[in-house]
Every structure is written in structure tokens, then in C-alpha cells.
Amino acid sequence: ADDEDCCSYEDRREIRHIWDDVWSSSFTDRRVAIVRAVFDDLFKHYPTSKALFERVKIDEPESGEFKSHLVRVANGLDLLINLLDDTLVLQSHLGHLADQHIQRKGVTKEYFRGIGEAFARVLPQVLSCFNVDAWNRCFHRLVARIAKDLP
């Protein structure tokens, strides 16, 4: 019930609507640009987080490795948003993501908080009626599950 209070049905519906605007199939290049802007914002506010992405060639933003990572992050978030009303599958997937991130040295709760802040700063720039409160309530709930065992 606590999850319901923090990310209500109305919040989930609003988030899916917002995300549909960002994620429509006609905007494939825009998706990568948005996630790149999110990472740029993250690195601006949390510069030490940049070292976590050396494996995906963060210093070569036009590389296939980095663009592929951006797509994976965006697709992962897309999946989570589309699972917001399927609690059992969502919880299973969040557990999987938590396991993946606990294995990555240097990943912290603070960086997850930072990427949430970055999305909240970037998305209003590309969406005219972005509901930051609904976004934060749902995004923070998802991140809390993924980052629960991180330092």
C-alpha cells in the first residue's frame, strides 16, 4: 500500500502519458538525444559518476558503445514505466536491475538520485506539460527499489 500512496494510479497514468510523448516511434533520434542530455546533466552535477561509464566509452559520445548504452538506459526506463501497473512483473524486474547494479563497483544511491534529478531537469525542456511531482513520486519509488542495497 505504501507504494500506491507514493506513486498513485493518477501519477502512473500521467507518467505513461508523459513518456508516450517522449517515446513515440517517430522520435527515435530524439530518444537518444534526451537520454544523452540526461547523462550530460548527471555528469555536470555529479562529475565523479562519469568514471562509472568508461566501459561504454563515455569520452567518445558518438561511439556505438556509448549510444548503445543510452538506448539500453532509455529502453530500461521505458520497460519500467510500462510495467507500473503490473506489480509482480515490475518487482521482479526491479530486483533484476538491483542485482545488476550492485555488481558494478562505484554505483551508489546518490548517483541514482542524481539521474532522477537529471531526468526531472531535462524532461521539462522537451515536454510542455511535464508533471514533475508525478514523475518524482514514481521515479523515486522505482529507484528506491533498484538502489536499496547500494552504498
Curated annotation (Swiss-Prot):
Gene Ontology MF terms: heme binding; iron ion binding; oxygen binding; oxygen carrier activity
Binding residues for heme b: H101
Domain of life: Eukaryota
Compartment list: Secreted
InterPro entries per UniProt: Globin, Globin-like_sf, Globin/Proto, Haemoglobin_extracell, Mb-like_M
Every Globin domain range: 6-151
Pfam families hit by this protein: Globin
One GO cellular component term noted in the UniProt record for this chain: hemoglobin complex
Disulfide bond annotation, renumbered to this chain: C7-C138
Keyword Transmembrane helix tagged: no
Recorded coiled-coil stretches: none
Keywords: Disulfide bond, Heme, Iron, Metal-binding, Oxygen transport, Secreted, Transport
Main location (coarse class): secreted
Record's keyword annotation contains Zinc: no
Quaternary structure note: The extracellular hemoglobin of the earthworm consists of 12 subunits that have a hexagonal bilayer structure with a molecular weight near 3.8 million. Each one-twelfth subunit is composed primarily of disulfide linked trimers (chains A, B, and C) and monomers (chain D).
Family: Belongs to the globin family.
Name of this chain's protein: Extracellular globin-4
Protein species of origin: Lumbricus terrestris (Common earthworm)
